[in-house]
Structure formats: structure tokens, C-alpha cells
Amino acid sequence: MAGNFDSEDRASWYWGKQNRQEAVNLLQGQRHGVFLVRDSTTIPGDYVLSVSENSKVSHYIINSVTNNRQSSTAGMVQSRFRIGDQEFDSLPTLLEFYKIHYLDTTTLIEPVSKSKQSGVIQRQEEVEYLRALFDFIGNDDEDLPFKKGDILRIREKPEEQWWNAEDSDGRRGMIPVPYVEKYRPPSSPGSALIGGNQENSHPQPLGGPEPGPYAQPSVNTPLPNLQNGPIFARVIQKRVPNAYDKTALALEVGDLVKVTKINVSGQWEGECNGKYGHFPFTHVRLLEQNPEEDFS
């Protein structure tokens, strides 16, 4: 499914002058495909597309082919924008393209919400983590099951004894406070266990330099369309689902998965080894269409 956002609404996705660490603080823990566009802190006129994907935050440099910002009515050539091998007339056109084409493991789904952030950059040290002291099966559909030792991220504290949290697979729900304890990640604030940035992520001062290399988008990788026939994928990352989630697929590297439904959340549905269930699309790599002779 393509992203559901208005690429012409610049105010919804453009964050202005912001360094890499600040973007990470906003995006880590967000679901796959949540993004923002910011100014490059190293090259005036260039931009950076920061995206939550594959349990990390990726940063894609957007080069301005010309740094001429003057109006074309004055006879000046307008800037074009290059990301990887692709070139676009405008930033909205670029965003539209990546609504239906993969960057690496995700398409663009929606901008990170400015209203939820209240215009204030969320520092990593403000993100609270918990460690499970006991197994929790869950009693209601809104509960988040977990096992002893799991690391969870607090999203909200609506009640004294029940908080809303997120696990490492992106599942969210209510958890009983007596079952968990406060947890501080052992690494620096630039890295987190859930949705953390796996690039060079040393904290930088406001407006500081861009550390680490930029990611490179895939070349012409469109979002698959199930209407064109069955879609198959090969498992590239082992997955052992929560023992209490009977709808989740267990995956072994090399398994063949027949994709039956593509959800915008990033949790796809499919068949693997005769079983049906959901799985994170980041754990598989799509194959060429219709390799049915290989499916068993």
C-alpha cells in the first residue's frame, strides 16, 4: 500500500535545520516508513530524508543539482533534486515516487507527527524503557503480551498501574506496571534497543556535523501489487514470535513465504511451511513474480 500523506503539504514533513541525532530522537521507535525531511548541516542547499526502517533510522542525502534558489521568472534555472541515481523536479515529486518505491526496506508511509511532538525535539534521554520482570500473557485485546527479560518502550502513562508500551517488533498495547522495572540502555543516548539508529550515532550539538555515511536507496524497487498475482519472498532474518501470539509466523532464514496481504503498518500476512500468519516485511526479501514452481 502506498503512503497516505500530502506531499505538497511541506509543513507536514519539512523540519528545517536539524542534525542527525535530533532526527533519530524523533524517529526511533516509530513504525516503518515514518519520515521527515531536514536541511543538510554540512552542505547548504541540500536536504536529508530521515526514515524509520528495519529497526533503525536511515538517512538519505538529497543533493540539489544546482544551488540556485532564485525564481525561474527571472530567467534562472530551477534546482533539481537527486537521491541515489534518481533525479526529480521537486521535493514533493521525490516523496511521491518513494510512496510506491522502496528506499531500502520500506516505502514512505507518513511524516512524523509534529502535533504529537508539540514542536519540541524529543531528546533520547527522555525516552523511557522498561524490562519485564515476569511473563505477561495478556487478558484483553488491548494488552501487550511479553516475556520475562523483554525490553519495552513507554508510549503513554494513562493509568497508575497500566501503561501503554511498544515491544521490539513494533507491537503496542497496555502493560501492568508491577510486571516491569525501569531500564536504562547500556549505550550512549545516540543508540536505543527499540528502533535505534544503527549507524554512527554519537550525540552531536545542535546544528553539528553529520556523522557517519548516508544510506543509499534501492534502484527502482516498487511496492508489490497483489492484483498482479501471487507474490513470494525469501526469509533473510530469523524470527521467533512471541509464544502467546498464535497469529505470528515463525521464520527461518531461507524459507519461502507466499505473501497474501500487504498492510501499510509493515506487518504483512502470508503462508510459510503450511502455516498462515503475520510477519514483519523487513524479515524477507521479495523474489521475482510467480516463482510458484519453487513454492512448497
From Swiss-Prot:
One of its GO terms (molecular function) is receptor tyrosine kinase binding. GO terms for cellular component: cytoplasm; plasma membrane. SMART domains: SH2, SH3. It is found in: Cytoplasm; Cell membrane. Residues 125-185, 228-289 form the SH3 domain. Phosphorylated on Tyr-214 upon cell adhesion. Results in the negative regulation of the association with SH2- and SH3-binding partners, possibly by the formation of an intramolecular interaction of phosphorylated Tyr-214 with the SH2 domain. This leads finally to the down-regulation of the Crk signaling pathway. Proline isomerization at Pro-230 by PPIA acts as a switch between two conformations: an autoinhibitory conformation in the cis form, where the tandem SH3 domains interact intramolecularly, and an activated conformation in the trans form. Required for apoptosis in Xenopus egg extracts. Involved in cell branching and adhesion. May mediate attachment-induced mapk8 activation, membrane ruffling and cell motility in a Rac-dependent manner. May regulate the efna5-epha3 signaling. This is Adapter molecule crk.
